Amino acid sequence: MNFSNKPNKSRKKSNRKNKKSNKSNTQKFFNENIVVDCDLFGVSENITNNAKSMNQVFDNESGISKRVQKPSVKNINKKNLKSKQKNRPAYWAQFDAQRFDSIGDPSAPNELYQSCDKSKLADLERQLSYQGGWTQFNSDSSMSYGIVSDDKLTHNNMMPYFSAKSGYGSNDLLNTSVMNYKNSLFTGNLKDTWKHKQEIKPHFKPVADSSYIHGTPIYSDDVRQRYESQASKLRQGEKLFDSIQVTPGLNLRHDEKGTHGYHSMYRPLEKTVDELRVRPKITYEGRIIEGMRGQERAAQAPVITYKPDTYKTTTKDDLLPTSDIKKAPKVIDNFIMKDTARHDQHIEYTGGAYTGSNHVGRNVPEYMQEKYKESTRQNFLAPKPMQKHSKTDTKFNPNLKSYELPFTLKDQNIHNKHPGITSSIFGNTTYSNLTDSAKFTNKQLIAEKSVTNTNIGTNNMRGTVHCMDIANPTIKEISVENRLNPNINGFSTIHRTYNPEIAKATIKETVIDNLEPSNVGQNIGSYANLTHNLNETIKETTVEIPQNNFVVPVGQYQRTPGLQDTTNPTIRETTVGINRNSNILPIGQYQRAPDMQDIARTTMNETIITTPWNNHITPINQQQSAPHPQDLFRSTLKETTIDLNRNSNILPIGQYQRAPNLQDNFRTSTRETTIEIPRHSQIIPTGQYQRAPNLQDNTNPTIRETTVGISRNSQIIPINQYQRAPNLQDNLKTSLKEITNSISRNSQVLPVGQYQRTPNLQDLPNTNLKEITNSMTRNTQINPVGQYQRAPDLQDITNPTLREITGNIHRNSFVVPVNQQQRAPDLQDIMNPTLRETTVGIHRNNIIIPVSQQQGPTNLQNNNNTTLKEISMSKHRNSIITPINQHQRAPNNQDIARSTLKETSIGIHRNTNIVPIGQQQRTPNPQDILNPTLRETIKIPYNTNINAVGQQQGRTNLTDSARSTIKETVVSIPQNYVTTAVGQQQGKTIQDSLRQTLKELNLENNHNSNIGTRENNLGAAHSFNRQPLRSTTKESIVDVPQNTHMTAVGQLKHKAPLLDTVRTTMKENIIQIPYNSVVTAVNQSQGSSSSFNREPLNTTIKEMVTDNKHIGQANHDGYGRGYGYLTEKKEAPNTNKQFTCQEVYIAPLEGHQKPKSYEAAYNAETNERKEALFKYRSPTDSGVNMGPDPDMINLKLRNDNHESRDPNTGYSFNNSLDRFNPQISSKISNSIDSCRNIDPMLVGQLDSNPFNIKYNI
């Protein structure tokens, strides 16, 4: 760059040619732009793009001549230019070209330049904003808004904060808090919380003669009588006698004082048993049976071991010393300290802690401090190197009059008035004291902030402007109106179309009647808009499945039912009328069609009770035969199961079971139910094989009479084991000993779970345990629990003790305990009153099989039984009633209504299968009349498939009327339709009317609707959706066209048209995305845009992101390529970037800091606390403080010192521009400053609390 005052000869010709054009351009500019109401952006462009304005030189206001860089243009009318300069508005100065107008002397970094100073321009902008009327705040007001008066407005939201105690300005609030905190730590004086004494104003105004200042006068008798008579005239509350306080208590004299308290300690004693009885117990004495008085242990022989010890005994010596929670004082012995040299070298320091490591010596007591006198000598710095081409120094000082002002303590404390922290070359931050009101939330800070794009590199003379959009209040408004495809990955050449549809109110309206062929592949047919009438219930949707359909439960294959079936009110009517050869399978299995002509039963018993002889009733998950429908109604469960045929088996849960004999009479007790088993028949308990009992046995009132008559050599086997018939001739025993004491000598008494022989019944009673056990022979064995035991002798007389019961057990008789083999009892036994009489007389060859075993058939001629025994004992041999989880056939639908569960399941036909839950089930006949129960509801046709959730489902008949129950919803799905559940493939039906339930949403999906992936179907739409919005989620999902693909949550979704109107919910924001656009989520890649945003500013971050109509962020790669924002007629606020992007001249040389003015020193305020802390520090090098004298303020002489002085270097900028690169960062502090103990504001709230108790310290 040429800095010479003379023009270059090589450029004379070109300058001579441009002279006239530049003059006309300058004249034209000032004639056209001297208007107050002009476009600032146009003015800026006119100035910066004008060659003449780029080289204009203006004189400063002080009139000091400066050396300027002469432009190449001559013959400029300077007089006219100066006149126009004085008449133009002041704010035009911000558009002036920045010039190198220094006079050659080094400039201080904090000095205001004439034209190229950033601080001056920023100050001018702030002045124009407030005084020029460009702000909403009144310049005359203090922004108190009338809430408080101006003199009482205090705040700390604009106080600058400095992390260190250096730099410009001070934070008095922080310093005060820190100093009070330190003062309270060392002195205990809580200055922040101490409330000083204040004078209290009198509550009333002073009144003359309100008191006697010279003493109270003497009252006269008239005055005294007047007041005293009035005071004692009424005498209210006085008694005619004196009260005497008496202590409470019972049986006290009139002058006795009670000592037991308020309540008397007297308590009446309860009467004893002898006092209450007519015949006292004290008159009777019992016999004392002496027992064992004591027991001594046998002598212990010495134990000798020869193997080594495998353990270790830990003693106190093995433990290591450790510490306890409470420690005792250390015991110090008396010893002599040897002299060392440490006491001569060690220095003890006292006083407050000091952070600096080089100031340790200053923290000493006052009596140990040095005695010195502050010097008044002036200290000067040596001059800097003067040689420009020095061989040893790389810096030089071209100014002989320059000086250096060192930093002092006063710079930290006084309220200086210089502009703040400014710099030109090494820094790029300008301090500005903002006076606007503080924002309360982050939203207020972000919403009203112009989009300045501060973090942008150099733009190579390309101007930037900022978006002035108005903020949208919600995220939806930000994202739904993005009509220009902002988030597109790269530029696309495809044509876009927009949907002018009106916004829907709900998601259902948006999805259910979508007429657009969106997401359509290339090889897909046309659409069929079906008009189905509204169904009110789920049952009506699925109940009318054709005959050949299958109804498969959840998770299985299911065909469509017949749609002509009428609603059944109960479950029984749904399932009872199944044909003979059909199977009713529970959920998830195959099911056959029932007989539809069955009349409704009132109970479950009537549904299953009429099972024929050779039928099978299979429980849940098994096959079941059809019941016999001619069975009469039973009132109890026993009547349901007792009438099984002779050859039928009643098996417990999980086993095979035959049909019962239905002619059995009712029994009144459990014994009548099980006692009449024939001798050679077997009664097997639950889960085992059981034979039919002898039905001629009379009723025994107790369990003992039922089992006591077992013969000698027979075996009594407990539950789940083989058991023989008892001897029924045994007399009644009165105790347990009589039942078990007649066991012969060589017999064995085995505990529960083992084999047991019959006892000897002729044994006399023993009175104690010894008599019971001492008369056992040598070879007799008493086996403990789980061992072998023989049957007892049933002729034994009652023994009063346990020994008499078990001592005389015969050798060859077996009594088998629980879980062992047991035979059937003799049913001719008379009633036994005890358990022994019930079990002792069991015959030898009879077998009673316990629960879970096989059981033989019963005699069906037995009379009515009243108990469970009578219900189950007389079952036929060959009938099988299969319990739960077994095979079960379908019932006969001609059965009359039953009132109980037994009648419902007993009359099942032979070859009919009723399959429980989880098994196969056939479809019912759809011609059935209305069924009152859920059973009547399941009339599913033959070959239809109904698929459950997550499986394939056929097409439904869309002309079905409304259903009222779930059954009607499930059964009437058309034959070849497929309804896909959540997360699966699903078709769309566009023309369906509004649905009210989820069932209506799922059932009407078209048949062969399969759509390819996004890669195959992208950009193949031909029309738009103009249907009204749906109100439910169901309507949004069910009406998917036949060949379309609807992707579930978390899957790929195609785009909707972006020309939709504003939605009110988030759902409306994402459903109407155009076809060929890709919406990128948060923190993902976004493409560039090709249009402009003319919308107002957004107030939240959400509105900035979602309603970004100016197509993404500015495209700038940092190398000058890219266009950034392209806007038209936008108001561009002044920024630092604006002031730095047009720099074409070099900056001046930087010198030392400019001294502060006399005004700043005169108005300085000294920090007394800070000076007190630095009382004992060493004298500074700056000399004594001479006071605020205009001649002496900040004055320092400087001499040249080539060894220590640094040159005031200059820098040259040729073609590289000085660009502004600000770094914006914010830090949110979640914790209180470590140097503050408590917030004074919190203490103030505590003091204002009326319930706070204040203590004077």
Curated annotation (Swiss-Prot):
<dbReference type="GO" id="GO:0044423">
    <property type="term" value="C:virion component"/>
</dbReference>
<feature type="region of interest" description="Disordered">
    <location>
        <begin position="1"/>
        <end position="26"/>
    </location>
</feature>
<feature type="compositionally biased region" description="Basic residues">
    <location>
        <begin position="8"/>
        <end position="22"/>
    </location>
</feature>
<protein>
    <recommendedName>
        <fullName>Uncharacterized protein L454</fullName>
    </recommendedName>
</protein>
<keyword id="KW-0946">Virion</keyword>
